[in-house]
């Protein structure tokens, strides 16, 4: 068992080399830049939304991002250490009291808004 954990830690170091993964939690707004490969073409596509869940499972860690597009809620699950993710940016931090925000699926408009963590200039 210890050998498997050691191997996973080595793989995580390889996959995060040259990448900075911010420390984000459910309720935070993030922008995930994905590499999309279509035939011979490769491009970067941004996906911005609220993190509604995070699963910390070593190399299999994942997180779910929800956004509203054209009035329709869209959720996408990302593997944290995927080589297809070029970068993750933390846009703003939210204040929530739950680890899983699945209840946001049933809310619309202002009710689905998450309070934002305010930083004073002294604390920055």
From Swiss-Prot:
PROSITE patterns: RIBOSOMAL_L19. One of its GO terms (molecular function) is structural constituent of ribosome. Pfam families: Ribosomal_L19 (PF01245). Coiled coil: none annotated. GO terms for cellular component: cytosolic large ribosomal subunit. InterPro entries: Ribosomal_bL19 (IPR001857), Ribosomal_bL19_CS (IPR018257), Ribosomal_bL19_sf (IPR038657), Translation_prot_SH3-like_sf (IPR008991). Keywords: Ribonucleoprotein, Ribosomal protein. GO terms for biological process: translation. NCBIfam families: rplS_bact (TIGR01024). Belongs to the bacterial ribosomal protein bL19 family. PANTHER family: LARGE RIBOSOMAL SUBUNIT PROTEIN BL19M, RIBOSOMAL PROTEIN L19. This protein is located at the 30S-50S ribosomal subunit interface and may play a role in the structure and function of the aminoacyl-tRNA binding site. This is Large ribosomal subunit protein bL19. It comes from Orientia tsutsugamushi (strain Ikeda) (Rickettsia tsutsugamushi).
């Amino acid at each position: 068992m210890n050998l498997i954990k050691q191997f996973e830690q080595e793989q995580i170091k390889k996959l995060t080399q040259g990448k900075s993964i911010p420390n984000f939690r459910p309720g935070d707004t993030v922008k995930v830049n994905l590499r999309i490969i279509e035939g011979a073409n490769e491009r970067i596509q941004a996906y911005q939304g609220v993190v509604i869940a995070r699963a910390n499972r070593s190399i299999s860690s994942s997180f779910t991002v929800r956004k509203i597009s054209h009035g329709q809620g869209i959720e996408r699950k990302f593997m944290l250490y995927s080589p297809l993710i070029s970068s993750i940016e933390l846009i703003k931090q939210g204040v929530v009291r739950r680890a899983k925000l699945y209840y946001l699926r049933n809310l619309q408009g202002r009710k689905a808004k998450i309070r934002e963590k305010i930083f004073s200039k002294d604390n920055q």
